[in-house]
């Protein structure tokens, strides 16, 4: 592909909106006003209400159409720009509160209308002698977006971003920390809009290194607009806390868990004049225990001869995580309309794993059983350095107009030595492997937003580029004999060095508009390119792939019901992409250990999907809310892992069954599902929220000659929040995930129950927390694999039942707010498998 032509096509797409932008800027705005205000709790403290919906309608006879709408910021403020002179009716809606209505009049020539504080009363309903009082929800559902207020969710407080995502509707986290959305682990994860999530294969910090105490909210977009990256089943944006109170503010915390688990943290900010300085530290020194068991029967072929080999493996071990993270940042207001932010975030990770194993091997029909005893040791050290700069320009005279720019880099250095020593039997006495990875990610993005002259529309355009450079080296060493004291020597056949560069430019344009009779619409188009080039240093294998794709998106919504904001129906569509990574395409044998190796597929194509959603949201006067979403995903060139038995290597290596794993496009798969969220106050001291999903998933088979399979699967979560007395918060949370199909078999059902308490102390200057994760110790990972040549049963148990005790001290103007707990880490390992 001609690279210069590709760049020109991106430039052409990015400038499609330029004539519209210039025309909009010429339109006069002097006769229009900005309507602004602040939504607050009607109580004595008048706390701000973030994420409240603000609607402005005509108040003239025969015309009650919607003029403008918006959402309050974290501090409760809102601004509706470009409002013509006239009479209007403003309505503010927040979950758990009675809606507020107020008349608004804009006089000709008036530049602004400041409404001041708009106090919303808690929704209440009399049930006999019990008063039901609404509270702000932990999970706030918006059609197309789910917002999770982490500060008020006790089940993940003090843990990490992984623990937070475990509680998000439609999101699942497995034992390795991999995040999946509606069954797909291919998704885009952002932190404050920047790349993140190395645990899911993306650039940026590991999600298990981001403390939950530093997260304000999480946004989940299952069908995002063209403004966002097209890669993955959706977008998860983790928004961190930002404090601009005058002077010193922050918090210090120490959390201790049974079995040698410690988590200290410190977060400080200082706002002086135009500058806000931020300093943060988070540490983890935690020891976990593990158990595992596997039983496997493999069918081996050697010409016309076949035989079956039965193997077992029992293991017990430990995992020791020691991590340190710093966060240094500066936000400076250059002018009233311009700001600049700088941040540097170094991370140090050290993970030690020790696993003692007992292995048996027996040819089916033979009385001879070979037993070996092994010890596998891994000592992983990773250093991550992030740095970024952000620029923001707004126009006070033209509310809603905004220019933002972001640039930064992420540098990753990893050293991963793994060794296995075996005693007994006739097999070689283990192996040693040394892996080194060095990666640099450079990214930059520019976005421009321009409201239309009548204030009912908005144009957004943007450019983005991301460059990934990666070099790595793997050295495999084998023993010279079966003697446990034998020397190890380099195995050049399974040792190699590689390097690659991947460039991903993108451009987008979207336009949204509020229409008459409660209708609104948004449409957009995104273009993304992928240019990847690299290979093995010896020149024996390489990858060279270039392609450009277009990704349209559209959303149509309408407000229903007699009251504004009471009911809303929305339809959305988006085309999305699963981009194969370098190692999935590199056609070399990469051994993880003597029994397993991966081999890339040079002919692997990108996977494309068409995603559709229909959603309905209903907000009731008593503070209850119900959201239902029906979704469908149609995938072309579905990428699937294919695992087979390497009979030749199994017979020659004398280490048991040797499996080969590769990737292939296996055709088309379809998935359909329903998600439901319900939240309601049952009493003044009790609020309940429930989320559930059920979906019909078609799974691509892991063998090319095997038909696809399909089955129903589902998840459910029920959270009960209690306030038995002032200053004491209690949360009891239960979750379950049904059996789900995998390419080779199925993953059995699992679930758990968590209990958390927090007592605020010293006039809300401090808090004491207690949390017990997996109270019944039921979280376990069990997997079954069934193919014509391989039958496997796997059992993995991570230490999930942990009691955590934490103390938090709030510094400066920061205080422990009701329903907010900031210390009580969750144990790692997802469902505990």
Residue ranges and their predicted role:
Residues 117-118, 161-164, 203-205, 220, ...:
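N-terminal periplasmic accessory domains that precede
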Residues 234-235, 239-252, 291, 312, 413, 531, 562-611, 632-656, ...:
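Surface-exposed extracellular loop regions of Gram-negative outer-membrane beta-barrel proteins
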Residues 441-445, 489-496, 599-601, 605, ...:
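Outer membrane beta-barrel strand-and-loop segments of large Gram-negative receptors
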Residues 60-77:
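Short, acidic Ser/Thr/Gly-rich low-complexity loop/linker segments typical of extracellular
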Residues 40-45, 53-59, 93-95, 112-155, ...:
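Short, acidic, small-residue-rich periplasmic hinge/interaction motif at the N-terminus
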Residues 161, 167, 194-222:
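Short acidic/polar hinge/loop motifs at secondary-structure boundaries
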Residues 215, 229-236, 244-295, 320-324:
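Outer-membrane beta-barrel translocator/receptor signature
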């Amino acid at each position: 592909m001609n690279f210069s032509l590709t760049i020109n096509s991106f430039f052409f797409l990015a400038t499609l909106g330029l004539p519209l932008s210039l025309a909009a800027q010429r339109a006069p705005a002097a006769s229009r006003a900005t309507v602004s205000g602040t939504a607050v709790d009607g109580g004595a403290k008048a706390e701000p209400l973030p994420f409240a919906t603000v609607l402005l309608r005509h108040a003239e006879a025969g015309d009650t159409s919607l003029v403008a709408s918006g959402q309050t910021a974290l501090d409760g403020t809102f601004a509706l720009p470009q409002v013509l002179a006239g009479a209007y009716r403003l309505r503010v809606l927040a979950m758990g509160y009675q809606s507020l209505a107020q008349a608004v009049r804009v006089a000709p020539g008036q530049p602004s209308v400041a409404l001041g504080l708009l106090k919303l009363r808690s929704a209440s309903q009399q049930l006999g002698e019990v008063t039901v009082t609404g509270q702000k929800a932990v999970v706030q559902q918006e059609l197309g977006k789910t917002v999770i207020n982490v500060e008020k969710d006790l089940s993940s407080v003090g843990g990490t971003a992984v623990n937070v995502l475990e509680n998000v509707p439609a999101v699942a986290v497995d034992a390795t920390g991999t995040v999946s959305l509606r069954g797909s682990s291919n998704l885009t994860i952002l932190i404050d809009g920047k790349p993140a999530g190395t645990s899911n294969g993306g650039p940026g910090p590991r999600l298990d290194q981001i403390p939950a105490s530093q997260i304000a909210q999480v946004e989940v977009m299952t069908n995002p607009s063209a403004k966002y990256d097209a890669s993955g089943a959706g977008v998860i944006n983790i928004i961190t806390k930002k404090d601009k109170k005058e002077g010193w503010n922050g918090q210090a915390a120490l959390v201790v868990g049974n079995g040698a688990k410690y988590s200290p943290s410190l977060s400080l900010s200082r706002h002086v004049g135009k500058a806000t300085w931020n300093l943060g530290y988070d540490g983890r020194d935690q020891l976990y225990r593990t158990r595992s068991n596997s039983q496997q029967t493999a069918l081996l072929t050697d010409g016309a001869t076949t035989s079956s080999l039965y193997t077992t493996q029992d293991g017990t071990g430990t995992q020791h995580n020691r991590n340190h993270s710093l966060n240094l940042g500066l936000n400076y207001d250059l002018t009233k309309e311009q700001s600049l932010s700088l941040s540097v975030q170094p991370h140090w990770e050290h993970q030690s794993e020790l696993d003692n194993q007992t292995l048996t091997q027996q040819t089916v029909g033979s009385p001879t059983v070979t037993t070996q005893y092994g010890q596998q040791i891994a000592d992983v050290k990773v250093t991550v350095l992030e740095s970024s700069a952000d620029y923001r320009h707004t126009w006070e005279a033209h509310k809603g107009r905004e220019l933002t720019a972001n640039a930064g880099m992420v540098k990753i250095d990893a050293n991963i030595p793994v060794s296995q020593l075996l005693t007994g039997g006739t097999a070689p006495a283990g192996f040693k492997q040394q892996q080194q990875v060095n990666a640099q990610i450079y990214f930059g993005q520019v976005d421009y937003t321009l409201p239309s002259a009548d204030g009912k529309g908005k144009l957004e355009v943007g450019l983005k580029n991301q460059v990934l450079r990666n070099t790595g080296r793997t050295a495999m060493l084998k023993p010279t004999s079966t003697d446990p004291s034998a020397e190890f020597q380099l195995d050049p056949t399974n040792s190699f060095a590689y390097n690659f560069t991947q460039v991903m430019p993108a451009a987008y344009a979207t336009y949204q508009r509020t229409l008459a009779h409660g209708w609104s619409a948004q449409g957009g188009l995104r273009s993304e390119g992928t240019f990847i080039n690299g290979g093995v240093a010896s020149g024996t294998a390489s990858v060279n792939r270039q392609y450009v794709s277009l990704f349209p998106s559209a959303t149509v919504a309408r407000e229903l019901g007699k009251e504004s904001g009471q009911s809303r129906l929305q339809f959305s569509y988006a085309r999305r992409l699963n981009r194969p990574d370098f190692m999935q395409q590199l056609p070399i044998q990469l051994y993880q250990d003597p029994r397993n190796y991966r081999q890339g597929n040079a002919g692997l194509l990108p996977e494309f999907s068409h995603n559709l959603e229909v959603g309905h949201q209903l907000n009731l006067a008593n503070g209850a809310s119900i959201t239902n979403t029906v979704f469908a995903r149609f995938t072309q060139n579905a990428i699937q892992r294919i695992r087979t038995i390497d009979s030749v290597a199994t017979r020659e290596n004398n280490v048991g069954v040797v499996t080969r794993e590769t990737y292939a496009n296996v055709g088309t798969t379809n998935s359909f599902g329903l998600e439901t969220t319900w939240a309601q106050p049952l009493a003044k001291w009790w609020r309940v929220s429930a989320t559930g999903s059920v979906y019909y998933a078609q799974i691509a088979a892991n063998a090319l000659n095997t038909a696809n399979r399909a089955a129903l699967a589902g998840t459910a979560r029920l959270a009960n929040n209690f306030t038995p007395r002032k200053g004491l918060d209690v949360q009891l949370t239960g979750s379950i995930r049904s059996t789900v199909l995998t390419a080779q078999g199925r993953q059995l059902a699992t679930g758990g129950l968590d209990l958390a308490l927090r007592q605020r102390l010293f006039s809300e200057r401090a808090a004491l927390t207690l949390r017990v994760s997996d109270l019944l110790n039921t979280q376990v990972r069990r997997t079954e694999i069934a193919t014509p040549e391989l039958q496997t049963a796997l059992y993995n148990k991570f230490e999930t039942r942990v009691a955590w005790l934490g103390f938090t001290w709030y510094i400066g103007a920061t205080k422990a707010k009701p329903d907010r707990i900031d210390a009580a880490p969750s144990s790692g390992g997802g469902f505990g498998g």
